[in-house]
């Protein structure tokens, strides 16, 4: 759904974003329940799909989609990009930042620090794609797919930028988010020259995906 709105502002149809933003407002409520019950985390999250009723829990039967917990974070970035296009400070302060704050809060609890000191999402997946593991098994669940880390890099950067624009003096909050941002795993290159879709250099089962 989010991708269908990418051109709304550019096409002079910015007001058409409102139903999506209203849905995201509802997801902060349902997603806070899911965050607590599924992950024992604060803030809110949403998964790969939602419904008219703003369901935030995993849904569907395709193994490479439902358990992706980054849906809300991805939508938050769209809210921030709407601000960048419109420079509507009221929208940034009263709509985008409160939602982004709740999304960032979720990842404060959800992220896992590995032995290398990187903060990883997981269990997660690279939506709608699967890999072949080093033992030859086809799989979807993994830790820290590249898409997750990239979305988080955008989300944390956007939230820090929003605090700066609004003149918010919250040094402890800023330092914590900056530390999380710095601890995200870097984008890696595979042995055959690709940007790695997963944290490990797995073989793609659908190279054209």
Where does each model-flagged region fall?
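Short, flexible loop/turn elements at secondary-structure junctions
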Residues: 11-12, 28, 50-52, 123-129, ...
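The feature captures the catalytic groove of carbohydrate-active enzymes
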Residues: 1, 41-94, 108-175
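Anion-binding catalytic surfaces of enzymes that hydrolyze or transfer phosphate/sulfate esters
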Residues: 34, 62-69, 200-209
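Long, well-ordered core segments of solenoidal/helical folds
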Residues: 22-35, 98-114, 180-192
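Carboxylate/His-rich catalytic cores and anion/metal-binding grooves
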Residues: 2-45
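Short, solvent-exposed positions on alpha-helices
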Residues: 15-18, 90-94, 98
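Long, low-complexity segments enriched in small/aliphatic residues
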Residues: 172-209
């Amino acid at each position: 759904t989010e991708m269908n709105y990418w051109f709304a502002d550019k096409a002079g149809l910015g007001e058409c974003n409102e139903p999506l933003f209203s849905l995201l407002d509802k997801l902060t409520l349902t997603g806070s329940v899911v965050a607590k019950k599924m992950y024992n985390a604060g803030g809110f999250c949403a998964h790969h799909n939602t419904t008219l009723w703003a369901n935030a829990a995993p849904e569907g039967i395709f193994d490479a989609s439902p358990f992706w917990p980054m849906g809300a974070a991805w939508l938050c970035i769209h809210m921030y990009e709407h601000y960048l296009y419109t420079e509507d400070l009221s929208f940034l302060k009263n709509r985008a930042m409160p939602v982004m704050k709740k999304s960032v809060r979720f990842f404060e609890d959800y992220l896992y620090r590995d032995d290398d000191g990187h903060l990883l999402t997981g269990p997660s997946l690279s939506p709608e794609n699967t890999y072949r593991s080093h033992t030859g098994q086809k799989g979807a669940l993994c830790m820290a797919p590249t898409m997750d880390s990239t979305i988080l890099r955008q989300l944390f950067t956007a939230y820090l930028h929003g605090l700066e624009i609004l003149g918010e003096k919250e040094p402890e909050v800023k330092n914590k988010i900056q530390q999380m941002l710095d601890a995200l795993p870097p984008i890696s290159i595979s042995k055959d020259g690709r940007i790695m879709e997963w944290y490990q250099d797995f073989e793609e089962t659908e190279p054209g995906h």
